[in-house]
C-alpha cells in the first residue's frame, strides 16, 4: 500500500506570496525607461537604456521593503518557492530546497537585504512564485491579496 505524503506547510502566508506575485507581475510588464536625450537608437548604443536600473522605481522599492520586513523563515520559503516554481526541485524535495535556501541566505554578509536583492534579480519572480504555490495546490488568485 502506497502512502500519500503530506504536503508541507509554508512559513510564508498565501496572502503575502500573492501580494508579491501581483507586484512582480506589474513590475514585469512596465514600460522600460528610455533616455530621451541619448540621441541614438537602441541597436547603436547596445540597448544601455534597457540595461540601466532605475533605483527610483517605486514598485521595486515597495517590493523590496515588503520582502525585507519578512522574517527569516518567510524569506527562506520565498527563495525555495521560487526555485520550486522554476523547476529546480519537486514538492517531494521541499525540505531540501528549504535547506539549500537557508544555506544560501546564511552565506550572505547581510542576509535580509541580499536575499531581497537575489529575489528581485529574478526576471520571472512572479511567475515562478505562482507556479511554486500551484505545486502546493494553492491558488494565489482566490481573493484580492492583502498581506
Regions found by a protein language model. Give the residues of each.
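Long, solvent-exposed non-transmembrane regions
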Residues: 2, 25, 110-112
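Short coil/turn segments at secondary-structure boundaries
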Residues: 35-36, 80, 93-95, 143-147
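Helix-rich interaction surfaces within compact, conserved domain-sized segments
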Residues: 104-147
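Amphipathic protein-protein interaction modules
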Residues: 71-116
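Polar alpha-helical coiled-coil and adjacent low-complexity
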Residues: 2, 62, 138-141
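Exposed alpha-helical structural elements
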Residues: 16-19, 62, 93-96, 114-115, ...
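Aromatic-anchored, charged helix-turn/loop surface patch used as a conserved interaction hotspot
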Residues: 4-78, 83, 105
